[in-house]
Amino acid sequence: MFATNVFGQMRVLRAVLPSMRKQKSGVVANLGSIGGWSGTPAAGLYCATKAAVAIYTEALCGELAPFGIEATCIEPGYFRTNFLSGGHKVVAQNRLPELDIATESTRAGLAAYNHHQPGDPAKGARVIVEALTKTGRCEGRKLPPRLALGRDAVTAIRAALARNQEGLDQWQDVVMVTDHDDVAN
């Protein structure tokens, strides 16, 4: 999964970046997912690949800016495609029955969601084109390092941010005591 979702995108970029740097312009659009914002039981490896792409893209923003090249990681929510259908999803070949209790709700939820996803692929594609070409609704906007795509993506990302903020707040008094004594607060 990392070979396709992460290293595949890196290989394509490695092939086109020399000419983009030479022309001092362009846009890099990597494909992430809302899965890159939280680990989901039964989808941890997929989520990890999408998180890796997002963080890699954030680094690219700084690395490519001196060349006039922008980078963004498009993070779609669920779009009504065959992505969740039998022949398109990766399933563990040697599933561990003892993990079923932790993963069954995810598998059942994704199966029920198949062909009921809220996102319209044509509308999503239009937003992507407008964002990358800075036309239409995206005229005059700067591309963010991570571009959520879809109402469900925005909702899921906000929930992930809130969970992380809550964890920071709850543990701040414990984890901030690690500085050397000669370091000022």
Go through each PLM region and give its residues.
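Active-site helix of classical SDR
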Residues: 13, 49
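Active-site-adjacent segment of SDR/Rossmann-fold oxidoreductases
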Residues: 38, 59-70
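Residue(s) in the substrate-gating loop at a strand-loop-helix junction
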Residues: 33
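SDR active-site lid
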Residues: 66-142
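Active-site loop immediately N-terminal to the catalytic Tyr-X3-Lys motif
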Residues: 38-44
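A hydrophobic alpha-helix adjacent to the NAD(P)-binding/active-site core of NAD(P)-dependent oxidoreductases
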Residues: 1
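A short helix-coil junction within the Rossmann-fold of NAD(P)-dependent oxidoreductases
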Residues: 15-24
